[in-house]
């Protein structure tokens, strides 16, 4: 089942309460991977995915060599303790942005109309953009999902900062939906850093990327946070055998049953023991499909365990329609026609209606 559809099924009474699936002493799914309706667990994700900052290490070194910069000064940190604040991230991205004359975006003679290499790009899918609103102390919704906060000053400020990367600081390319995939951003060899999900290790970076790549934690505005997601399996309330269904799902959720996807890097484990037991973690990340083991352990495994919050579809209904509307709302901002505040306020009634209709 799609993530965004879970709570609609639960609202219609179609999903069973699965709170008894795991008992005392069991390895359990990470709490952020639990779909809840009115506080009741109704599904767990079958895999975990978190957002990170990925980078083309070959291109980073090339840009540094052209400018006489020490690569270690501009390499994304892999530890949340060392995460860049937003201003540091922007300045670093500007240093890594070069025009056709070799001048970076901090140089007063930089030519923003003729950029050769961009320092960064941010994935602008609406569900991914919420991480920045959360990092700035808000979100699209309140923490308990009872209120739509898309127009909060913190959310608007965070989203405007994403637009400013292109429009003000010239360190990110103009926003297009095609550029969201790492194949298009890092794969172009014209972008040094890009945000996207951990699944890219298995779908692109591991098997297909013809460059050395690395992974870091996301920069932060106020709070060091990433968001997680993963498609769920469910137990229908109409089943005559709920205990057996939960027992089967509990077996299915064991990492051994999806090992090929985990080993490839497409999926991450859901059970907490794979994040806390060194032997299990080592089995998971000690393979050639992954980047440097210590880097991945810190930037992805520990980050997912300690800094991940649930994407809003785990606790809010109607996110598919809400995000589709946001995609349209944001388009005028990416085009430079409106500020984020103008675009959101012009469409606020429609957004609030979508929320209210699905979360009455």
Task: Explain the meaning of each model-derived region.
Residues 1-54, 61, 87, 108-114, ...:
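Hinge/lid segment of periplasmic solute-binding proteins
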Residues 3-4, 81-88, 173-187:
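Short helix-initiation/N-cap motifs at beta->coil->alpha
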Residues 16-28, 71-81, 110-119, 138-157, ...:
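Short, solvent-exposed loop/beta-turn-alpha elements that line the ligand-binding surface or hinge
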Residues 36-47, 51-53, 81-148:
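Extracytoplasmic/periplasmic solute-binding protein
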Residues 39, 206-273, 328:
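Extracytoplasmic/periplasmic substrate-recognition and gating elements
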Residues 90-95, 131-133, 143-176, 205, ...:
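Glycine-centered hinge/linker elements that transmit conformational signals in sensory
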Residues 209, 216, 263-328, 332, ...:
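Long, aromatic- and glycine/proline-rich binding clefts that accommodate carbohydrate-like moieties
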